[in-house]
Amino acid sequence: MPFNLDELLAAYSTYQRFVALEPNPHHLRYIFPLFEGTYFAYRKIDVLRVTHIAKSISTKPSYIDIGCGYGDFLRKVREYIPNAIGIENDFTLFHILKKPKPDYIYLGPIEGFDKKAVDTAFVGWMEPGVDFRKFVASVANCVITTFDEGGQCGINGGCEYEEFGLQRIAYWRTPSWIDVNTELMNKYYTPSLLSQDTRSHLKSLRSSHNLWYVYSKKDFSNCVREGLHNWIQNEKTMTEMFDFESILDECGYHFKETLQASMSKEPLWEVIFDVDSHDLDGSFHKSPLMKSKDTDQ
């Protein structure tokens, strides 16, 4: 993602001053996601969903993370797909952080990528005003993308891939880093401004704005759907977590929790298969996002 150097340096200076206060290190990834985390909050279960979707296409899938930043999410994926690569259009961040660039992250725009098919492309963030979806759809058999429900990505908030010939298979909802940031700030960093009653009230209003969409080309839709469905059965007994997931729980974003103030009533991390996607038992999981369309017809 492109950065204004002066703004980046100013942000990094603020980050350094904050680090000097010795806060909870897990707070940093949600307060300064550019330097410590990602622009989307995730759990280990998200990493495993992504990797199992990729492996449903091939036992040794080709995988590319587009706009991977310094590779926070990509590193987690590489634990399961060792040949996964990333592409980043701006290496300024590596210089600012004084971090060596891994050899599996490549510099340049995605349009300069050697146009050969990849099994799975992950798009965790698309800079406002930038739109590379057409190219991604042309090279990837499966696209997994995350974006803020407010449409703060691409051109005119366009983050979907149906218009480029891909079929949406499923989606799930998680908090954005901003959602978590708000809860952390209210709880830990504005104590003099908020009474306990006020903090409790604000917590009851918390919402969740990040969506994960799974797309595929038609020829791969069945295996992607089946791979995701089969993996979900394993989640029922899964106990593995990243250490930083404790912050999500602490802020009220538990796995499968339903937020009372949210416009959408599906539980967090609940996989919803699209209206035209059958579960293996023949049932439908209809997306709540489709209801308004049905009503209009």
Label each residue range with its predicted role:
Residues 1-57, 273, 282-292, 296:
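S-adenosyl-L-methionine
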Residues 54, 108-116:
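Short amphipathic alpha-helix with an adjacent loop that forms part of the alpha/beta core around
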Residues 60-69:
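Conserved class I S-adenosyl-L-methionine
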Residues 69-71, 88-93, 127-128, 148-151:
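Short, polar loop motifs at secondary-structure junctions
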Residues 72-109:
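Class I SAM-dependent methyltransferase SAM/SAH-binding core
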Residues 119-131:
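A short SAM/SAH-binding and catalytic strip from SAM-dependent methyltransferases
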Residues 129-219:
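C-terminal substrate-binding/active-site "lid" region of AdoMet-derived donor-dependent transferases
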Residues 183-297:
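Rossmann-like AdoMet/SAM-dependent catalytic core
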